Amino acid sequence: MPRSSRGGARGLVVVGDTTDDLGRLGRALAEHLDWPLLAEPTSGARGGPQALVRYAELLGAPAGAELSGRAQRVLVLGRPSLTRSVTALLARSDLPIDVVTATARWTDVAGTAAAVHAVGPGDRDAPGLAAALGLEPAPPSWTAAWHRAVDGLPDPPEGGEALTPDGVALAVYASCDPARAERAPDLVLGSSMTIRRLDRLAPPACGPAPAPIANRGLAGIDGTLATALGAALAQEDGAGVRAVVGDLTFLHDAMSLGRGRHEAEPDLQVVVVDDAGGAIFSTLEYPAVMAPRVFDRYFTAPQGADVAGLARALGARVSRPRTMSELRHVLAGPVRGLSVVHVCAGGCG
């Protein structure tokens, strides 16, 4: 059992990409301590009354800066890597940061962790672990203040029937929520903008949190479809796998959908959010320092490939919904065989 390292009561629980059991522990700790929960989509922790939506956006706003300035401790599980505002929070040297990990080693990117606590299978009891670490519950007003601050953020735009990247990602996420479907498909997320859209907007689950799969780390978008294919071939419950990726992620790994004539067809549906290139770069500094034409050519890099034609050439059935209602109808069906849903979400023609 880890040793205690005393700290204040106004804490935050941050859960990044991790194993399902460690994610559940993070959620249980947040609920036991009444601390706000900042959980990435692949954490397995994104659920319950402590979980915040749009937390990274809040941290970058004045209200979030004021609240995080009042925090007395941060508890980290897994490897948060999706947003700059969370990275900045974990780089603070004035805030005690404790890490709970199931592995013998944990990379402290900012060099600010006060302690790293390795927990074994017998240390997954949240009240016992909290006591061992000297973690004190916060007053209910602490988490309530964070929820009020999130509610005070400007409302995200409503897409209506238009196919927007945010709306498509949320629809796919909802279709794979085990609380909404008796046999929900497993979910694989593209590692560029798709996972970040869901990190910002996916609502916390009321019951067990969805646990999507995503490639993290140096691989970037490479191999995402191979990962989805492997998950589909390994699946045993027959619900299939649904992947949601951008057009560049699809094109980088499209040949993974090919198979030999004697190989089994996977139950895999790939939803391609085609927004004409790499949208993630528009969220960084590059557009402000170069001409739009240069930025579009070298960073957004829209492609001339025929996504639907390529998918058909690889043996996939293709559908192309034109509205959100049509997309939801496609997503309401079971995942059987190999299919690609090509969603034109801006600029793809």
Report each predicted region and the residues it spans.
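Conformationally flexible catalytic loops at phosphate/diphosphate-handling active centers
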Residues: 1-6
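Thiamine diphosphate
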Residues: 200-349
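Glycine-rich, anion-gripping cofactor-binding loops and their flanking helix/strand elements
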Residues: 12-109, 207-237, 251-258, 322
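Structural motif
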Residues: 10, 73, 186, 240-242, ...
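Terminal amphipathic helices with adjacent charged low-complexity linkers/tails
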Residues: 97-140
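Active-site diphosphate/adenylate-binding microenvironment
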Residues: 143-238, 339
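Redox- and metal-dependent alpha/beta enzyme cores, enriched for Fe-S-associated oxidoreductases
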Residues: 15-50, 171, 181-185, 195-201, ...
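Short beta-strand segments
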Residues: 14-16, 76-78, 100-101, 190, ...
